[in-house]
């Protein structure tokens, strides 16, 4: 048994019994750049050393969520606003995404995890679009867990794109005004077919949701930790889930 799996088993044994697990966990992976500044004497002098370290944290969290029985895990990797960063930093981030998609494909196959990417993928470099399409297609038949990366994602942008498509369907009489409902609007979103997140975790201590899944988190439990994303471990995920299980979810009632 791998060390990560041993840790996940220990975590499962220590969770409160009889309390429900979140079906869908979403994480705002914040704190990569602050981690880099904190460790700059040990880091390579590159703009995204913190992001590389953060990428190394992902497999442990995915393994833990999978072992616990979480159905969907959504990770906020790159926002629409991140395009305002320097061209060199953005280019390095896209290079990192490409290398991670290629190197981690066997990880997904071994665990039978389905990959999905949400956001306006049309604005990404063509090589990255191709790698996303290939990895998504190669894992589309898996059902143990769905791993969703939000790349060039912003919730307002998602809603604008959804409403444009909905308007086109109204104009072509594919749907009528009377068909419009919360469920119909949800079906036009990038997250169509996924349950809404039960738990949203934000690392790095900032108290905001940063234009992430605004429609979907209407009744989601929020958990903020000061731990920076590269330092976030399975034990930190356990603490978030324990806190979630201690809350009474009322769905706005």
UniProtKB/Swiss-Prot annotation:
Binding residues for Mg(2+): 30, 221
Pfam families: Prenyltransf
MF GO annotations: magnesium ion binding; prenyltransferase activity
EC number: 2.5.1.-
Keyword Protein biosynthesis annotated: no
Annotated InterPro entries: UPP_synth-like, UPP_synth-like_CS, UPP_synth-like_sf
Cofactor names: Mg(2+)
Binding site for substrate: 31-35, 51, 79-81, 83, 85, 202, 208-210
Active site, per annotation: 30, 82 (proton acceptor)
Keyword Transferase assigned: yes
Cofactor note: Binds 2 magnesium ions per subunit.
Gene Ontology biological-process annotations: polyprenol biosynthetic process
Coiled-coil intervals, chain numbering: none
Protein family according to the UniProt entry: Belongs to the UPP synthase family.
Function: Catalyzes the condensation of isopentenyl diphosphate (IPP) with allylic pyrophosphates generating different type of terpenoids.
The protein's name in its UniProt record: Isoprenyl transferase
Phylogenetic classification of the source organism: Bacteria, Pseudomonadati, Chlamydiota, Chlamydiia, Chlamydiales
